[in-house]
Amino acid sequence: MLKKIIGIGVSAMLALSLAACGSENDENASAAEQVNKTIIGIDPGSGIMSLTDKAMKDYDLNDWTLISASSAAMTATLKKSYDRKKPIIITGWTPHWMFSRYKLKYLDDPKQSYGSAEEIHTITRKGFSKEQPNAAKLLSQFKWTQDEMGEIMIKVEEGEKPAKVAAEYVNKHKDQIAEWTKGVQKVKGDKINLAYVAWDSEIASTNVIGKVLEDLGYEVTLTQVEAGPMWTAIATGSADASLSAWLPNTHKAYAAKYKGKYDDIGTSMTGVKMGLVVPQYMKNVNSIEDLKK
């Protein structure tokens, strides 16, 4: 029977994960034995956790335990294990700063439990593009790469303020900003409310676009919420736009729930990925199927 441990803190997760690593990095032990059949996850309501539930069923990992807490707890646990070269399996996704900080690898997913590659979309409330075509033009033209986003994520993870790092990025990448703002006019105090999910990637993108909008004369409000409330805010019109829609897999349920109540005005990033992730020093596991051995 698949087991879940929900809503624990950083200290508790560290204790659980380190206890799970009873075999340490014994290459003769199976991956299941090395991690005591435990996967370290993130927030229980997130899309990647739902997909991980599906993957565990698809691959008959019914006697495994999926631990859920915050993404901060997950990365703290990863750091603790990585520094000690302990085996660990986590739920992971790119873009994320941990792939720049650590040598990690995705486990192959031959059954496609996590679906095909994701994209990050920009969505708006209904009517926004007609009411604010200038801002909508900027948002629809916003596109960047994982490496570019990574410039911001890694600095924020190191303790710098998102707004400060975003301003530095905008000042450094003037040609790119010129592409995003092509045909966009300056305004005087027009208001815009951007809702975003508190993921490192969305903190980066929302702060950058927030800075660009401010430089164009907009009065910008950034509202941090969970994924569900973000979609609700767009659907009900309490927020104007969000750069945080991960489709077609992560936010599939929300997109279906609010179909017809929002507009998708562009894709800011392609090639986004999620799945089960391990350190590269775990040589004996390369596929989710290996976890059954």
UniProtKB/Swiss-Prot annotation:
Key word Signal present: yes
Residues lipid-modified (S-diacylglycerol cysteine): 21
Domain of life of the source: Bacteria
Locations listed in the record: Cell membrane; Membrane raft
GO BP terms: amino acid transport
Its membrane topology: Lipid-anchor
Molecular-function annotations in GO: transmembrane transporter activity
Covalent lipidation (N-palmitoyl cysteine), chain numbering: 21
Stretch forming the signal peptide: 1-20
Alphabetical list of InterPro entries matching this protein: ABC_Gly_betaine_transp_sub-bd (IPR007210)
Pfam families recorded: OpuAC
Assigned GO CC terms: ATP-binding cassette (ABC) transporter complex; membrane raft
Keyword line: Amino-acid transport, Cell membrane, Lipoprotein, Membrane, Palmitate, Signal, Transport
The keyword Transport belongs to this UniProt entry's keyword annotation: yes
Its job: Involved in a multicomponent binding-protein-dependent transport system for glycine betaine.
Subunit structure of this chain's protein: The complex is composed of two ATP-binding proteins (OpuAA), two transmembrane proteins (OpuAB) and a solute-binding protein (OpuAC). Interacts with FloT.
Name by which UniProt lists this protein: Glycine betaine-binding protein OpuAC
